[in-house]
Amino acid sequence: MSLQGKVALVTGASRGIGQAIALELGRQGATVIGTATSAAGAERISETLKANGVEGAGMELDVSNDESVATVLANISQQFGQPLILVNNAGITRDNLMMRMKDDEWFDVIDTNLNSLYRLSKGVLRGMTKARFGRIINIGSVVGSMGNGGQVNYAAAKAGLEGFGRALAREVGSRSITVNAVAPGFIDTDMTRELPEAQREALLTQIPLGRLGQAEEIAKVVGFLASDGAAYVTGATIPVNGGMYMS
């Protein structure tokens, strides 16, 4: 278990991809703190971690609020130690066509999906630098590369996430801190299960592997990037999209 003794912070961990990532890092031996936007969500994370034999806890966090971020990072350090693995997974969508998009639909997505990387990464870097070890893993999207109608806000945030990671990787590499991104395609989640059957079928025709991805398949890639086996990987974006977009 290569992550034994390391503290990992996973934002947006109450379900789906975030939950799968939290459990995978825990399986590798990390102490995992997963965050949710509500106290009830944080409690569910704590229960899920405990049920799966993972040390750690759920915490309530608003990634768009400076004070909330500072409080959670302080609590983690006091209770568990400095987080040396950060997975920026929390994100929202506010879909609309550009002509109809309201200001708050744009700014809310940018603040939650992109500005949060600045807040959280800056908050953990001092501890990582002191330890001369760190893993920052940002969860992007295939939409950041190929675009998607009705999601100019989301696409901009996810494309920005990749540029952010490459620049930061250059800044902190000399301290043995790696910064990478994982860009999922369409994953089998509650959201995609609610799509009309015709829309799901049309979606599958765009995916050479002919199926939606599983959250656990994203988690396995994140687990690799967090491990010692990925010590020489930095500034990379790893697509996990079934061939929907090839670069």
Task: Identify the meaning behind each predicted range.
Residues 141:
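Residue(s) in the substrate-gating loop at a strand-loop-helix junction
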Residues 28-44:
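Conserved glycine-rich Rossmann-like NAD(P)H-binding loop of the short-chain dehydrogenase/reductase
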Residues 7, 14-15:
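Conserved glycine-rich cofactor-binding loop
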Residues 121, 157, 165:
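Active-site helix of classical SDR
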Residues 97-98, 102-110, 192, 203:
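Substrate-binding pocket helix/loop in short-chain dehydrogenase/reductase
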Residues 173, 178, 233-235, 241:
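Short, small/polar-rich loop/turn modules that mediate ligand/substrate recognition or access, typified
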Residues 126, 170-174, 231:
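Alpha-helical segment proximal to the catalytic Tyr-Lys
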